């Protein structure tokens, strides 16, 4: 870095991509072991190594950006493009689930009784917990925008308050979704309705947990004065991701809960 004459970040060799890949392998293998052999040892090992990798990789990035100043405006521009492309890939990921749902529901086969929901399936009432979940996520979208505007204006206390409210709403959403799953009158093995419902809403729930983790990291970073009104891409990326999760839920609610029931 001593004689560098450009604005790009020359990254040092890092073990975290390798440990992250290995922990992902352990987690997926552990899930298979849990499903088929009722053993959670490999899954717990995978989750532990994944959490350790996340912590150490995040720590290194914070060190490089906040304390060493490697994240120049040029580097931040590249990171913005990267986050946008990542969110586009996630949109395509969820498009596959919506495709599966509409493929099955718009032309139900005789095996399903020629109707949707299939014969024998009692769908959830869209005006009960799902509607509450929708209002919770919409409220969290408002509070994350409040946090972002407070940060832009240099209002640290309001930013922390708004971010805390967003995290609390995200956790509340996850708890509501868990209770809904627990009380649902159908399971993932109840044909195409159960599988499309639980895979689509389950992956969305996973994204809410990931987004909440992202926001919790931002909360602790803000407590340590890591963000300024002009240098806060970590928070901006988390806010974009949260808005994406919000919009996907609206499509899920309208398609699967409301129209699909």
Curated annotation (Swiss-Prot):
Q: Which residues lie on this side of the membrane: Mitochondrial intermembrane?
A: 35-40, 106-128, 184-190, 257-261
Which domain of life does this protein belong to? Eukaryota
For the protein in the UniProt heading, the enzyme class is translocase
Can you list the GO cellular component terms from the UniProt entry?
Answer: mitochondrial inner membrane; respiratory chain complex IV
Question: MF terms per GO, please?
Answer: cytochrome-c oxidase activity
How is this protein situated with respect to the membrane?
A: Multi-pass membrane protein
Q: Which reaction does it catalyse?
A: 4 Fe(II)-[cytochrome c] + O2 + 8 H(+)(in) = 4 Fe(III)-[cytochrome c] + 2 H2O + 4 H(+)(out)
What transmembrane ranges does the database entry give?
A: 16-34, 41-66, 73-105, 129-152, 156-183, 191-223, 233-256
Compartment(s) of residence:
Mitochondrion inner membrane
What is a biological process (GO) this protein takes part in?
A: respiratory chain complex IV assembly
Offer one Pfam family short name for this entry.
COX3
Segments in the Mitochondrial matrix topological domain: 1-15, 67-72, 153-155, 224-232
- The EC number on file is 7.1.1.9
Keyword set for this entry?
Answer: Membrane, Mitochondrion, Mitochondrion inner membrane, Translocase, Transmembrane, Transmembrane helix
Q: Which Gene3D superfamilies match?
A: 1.10.287.70, Cytochrome c oxidase, subunit III, four-helix bundle (1.20.120.80)
Q: Does the keyword ATP-binding apply?
A: no
Please explain the role this protein plays, according to its UniProt record. Answer: Component of the cytochrome c oxidase, the last enzyme in the mitochondrial electron transport chain which drives oxidative phosphorylation. The respiratory chain contains 3 multisubunit complexes succinate dehydrogenase (complex II, CII), ubiquinol-cytochrome c oxidoreductase (cytochrome b-c1 complex, complex III, CIII) and cytochrome c oxidase (complex IV, CIV), that cooperate to transfer electrons derived from NADH and succinate to molecular oxygen, creating an electrochemical gradient over the inner membrane that drives transmembrane transport and the ATP synthase.
Describe the family membership recorded for this protein in Swiss-Prot or TrEMBL. Belongs to the cytochrome c oxidase subunit 3 family.
How does the record describe its quaternary structure? Component of the cytochrome c oxidase (complex IV, CIV), a multisubunit enzyme composed of 14 subunits. The complex is composed of a catalytic core of 3 subunits MT-CO1, MT-CO2 and MT-CO3, encoded in the mitochondrial DNA, and 11 supernumerary subunits COX4I, COX5A, COX5B, COX6A, COX6B, COX6C, COX7A, COX7B, COX7C, COX8 and NDUFA4, which are encoded in the nuclear genome.
What is this protein's record name? Answer: Cytochrome c oxidase subunit 3
Source organism (scientific name): Tragelaphus imberbis
